[in-house]
Amino acid sequence: LHCPQCALGLTLHQPGNRGICHGCGLVTAVPESCPSCGVQEIVHRGTGTQRLEDQVRSQFRGIRVARMDTDTMRTRGSHEKTLTAFRKHEIDLLVGTQMIAKGLDFPNVMLVGVINADAALHLADFRASERTCQLVTQVAGRSGRGPRGGRVVVQTSTPEHPAMRAAAVHDYEAFVQSELPIRESLLYPPFGSVVRIVVRGAVNDAAADWAKYLVQRLTKSVQGNDTIRILGPAPAPISRIRDRYRWHLQVHGPDPGTL
């Protein structure tokens, strides 16, 4: 099921059987049958925290499970209430998003699982590898703070990626050394600056034409300056949000002043 206003699929949220678009915020009831073929045997699949909580409850019956994400932490004080219960051993297993990765100190946590650790590794962002390494390292640091030690299990489809290898052995310096040459060759920070320009329009062809026009003007204005590179235009990673088509381009240069 896709959002009618965005180039995004709807995310199933329970309870309530709601489909929510994380681009524009549209909330709609999930149909009982497929709107395309009419079949009624719809199987809901996913990898979110809600799905993971259901799997944990079915596999480990009898344990006390809580979930921390934007859905469960909406009410005032719910965040601290859940953490206090976990600290007092009133919760056996805590499922959550990145919000449980930072700043929490629980000496009795002996096992941490990082599910689908490389979900953000291949995003269209030059900082994706860096952020993934940071996140996995931070989450892994929640385990084994007490005298009994602990264990960390990381689920990944790319175990040989430098970010994963470095996070597995807490060697952030090794990741930095592998990442810096790539950044330098592409003029990404800290070796250069990047300006991203996004063109939005109600008509896709018009937005594309404006993006191409910008590239032509920019290319002409920096002619003879080999320190500036222009990439694009291309459809943005999310090519439509709120019925506005999106095209983007990037300008790379040695410093913000030049750009």
Go through each PLM region and give its residues.
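Inter-lobe coupling/hinge segments of SF2-like helicase ATPases
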Residues: L1-Q216, K220-S221, A236-S239, W247-Q250, ...
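Conserved small-domain helix->loop->beta segment predominantly found in fold-type I
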Residues: N225-P237
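Hydrophobic multi-pass inner-membrane translocation pores used for secretion
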Residues: T227, T258-L259
